[in-house]
């Protein structure tokens, strides 16, 4: 079993630290300072970095980390080739911490965005899926992002999902506006408000939970997904 910890960074980012024993893998380091502090505090060995896409709030920590760890294995799609020395393609399989890690095509937010699924248990999805929401489609390729969400929906419902941003409360306000009232939505919103009032993360979430409260996962076709995304962009 892995120990997975969110490292808060910037205004609302989470850098995920995946730990096994004294080794750690870092996902999307937006800032090197909190990563290095976490490693030092817990006396860990940094063994690899996973990058989901090329936005600066997911990669700005890379120059400093590579200067400290020049031999580090860095996995990512071609769009992060300036940092990654192990370029991944959709449906590649990696072995990390004795887990089979599947690389899932997740384009739309960026052209080559990927997600990493550890053994049908843990999904690190960058900016594709958030609790109660999904990422903006900066490429304009709504089909690609809709398809990515369909791939996620096909996973086991117990999969834990680790998005890269704390957007839950604002996303749930939108969900409340567009979905029929439900006990699940009310309870999850109440829980999220309590957690944030204590400055605690609302993440990870689960696929089971998101299927109940995420309007983008409930979109039945591409047209409905596009309409929802446009609504959210102007919400």
From Swiss-Prot:
Pathway: Secondary metabolite metabolism; methylglyoxal degradation; (R)-lactate from methylglyoxal: step 2/2
Enzyme class: hydrolase
One GO molecular-function entry: metal ion binding
CDD domains xref list: hydroxyacylglutathione_hydrolase_MBL-fold
Enzyme Commission number(s): 3.1.2.6
Cofactor note: Binds 2 Zn(2+) ions per subunit.
Reactions accelerated catalytically: an S-(2-hydroxyacyl)glutathione + H2O = a 2-hydroxy carboxylate + glutathione + H(+)
The keyword Cytoplasm appears for this protein: no
Family under the similarity heading: Belongs to the metallo-beta-lactamase superfamily. Glyoxalase II family.
PANTHER family: HYDROXYACYLGLUTATHIONE HYDROLASE (PTHR43705), HYDROXYACYLGLUTATHIONE HYDROLASE GLOB (PTHR43705:SF1)
HAMAP family: Glyoxalase_2 (MF_01374)
Function description: Thiolesterase that catalyzes the hydrolysis of S-D-lactoyl-glutathione to form glutathione and D-lactic acid.
Name of protein: Hydroxyacylglutathione hydrolase
Organism phylogeny: Bacteria, Pseudomonadati, Pseudomonadota, Gammaproteobacteria, Pasteurellales
